[in-house]
């Protein structure tokens, strides 16, 4: 490709700062790097945005693995703090009756994100969007760091709720919704959040509308797995996307929600019409379900989407 076709795209890279956990799923035979913010950041990097993770790891081999992988992917590591006293986040994965059982370990390095360092990174990056979830809010140090992070960033806030039992509560959800512009949740999470705020509307759409109005959100997106997704916006407009055509066998659904969120962020930053962004997000999430794990190992996976979407 001629250089003059590449250079404008490089200059137009948009900064997205993602706050939260980087962790490793520890299987009996291997470890796999993940965490929702990290998976979203990987996708944004592959689609030629400039994601910066604000997270914290231990001074250990998993940190070395993470930094090597981020370097391989061309990702910025400036926001990855190092903790001498706590390990890199881990999720223990065990096989039980033919399925996986996940245990998210407590008191990990990402529970101790340093607010001052996060502040310096955020102010230097000047993001066009920020992303956060609930898991990294389970401890006071990271919760305070997130509060400072959100106060620093004057751009839109994307809250990907990702409730992980037992690491969430009504207080965390309320505080997060109050600081958000765009919120993504699945249909089960919608029921949980609606119950927190005594919303007894008869349909999911009316529950979503009540949440959107109560917290003055711009968009509330609800994913429904194989049945697609829908949203409601501040103008009370609703959009639905049909189930994506599954062209390959479903291998697992790990990371499908992260893939969906990443493409919605891309769409918002590139001013795609929301029905287009929803359809593309659903299409990409379905493709992720056709591979093992939450993100592809090879960049070639992204090329057909970049070509189709003119990225």
What are these regions (language model features)?
Residues 2-15, 201-311:
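Conserved phosphate-binding/catalytic region of the ribokinase-like
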Residues 2-17, 69-72, 77-80, 96-239, ...:
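Ribokinase/PfkB-type carbohydrate-kinase core domain
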Residues 16, 25-91, 95-99, 106-111, ...:
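Substrate-binding N-lobe of the ribokinase-like
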Residues 20:
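Active-site beta-alpha turn of Rossmann-fold NAD(P)-dependent dehydrogenases/reductases
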Residues 24, 59, 163-165, 189, ...:
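Short, glycine/acidic-enriched loop or turn micro-motifs at the edges of active sites
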Residues 26-27, 191-194, 297:
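A short acidic, helix-capping loop that chelates divalent metal ions and anchors anionic groups
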Residues 30, 194-197, 254:
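Short, flexible helix/strand-to-coil boundary loops that buttress conserved ligand/catalytic motifs
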Residues 42, 46, 68, 148-151, ...:
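Short, well-ordered alpha-helices that flank and scaffold nucleotide-derived cofactor binding pockets
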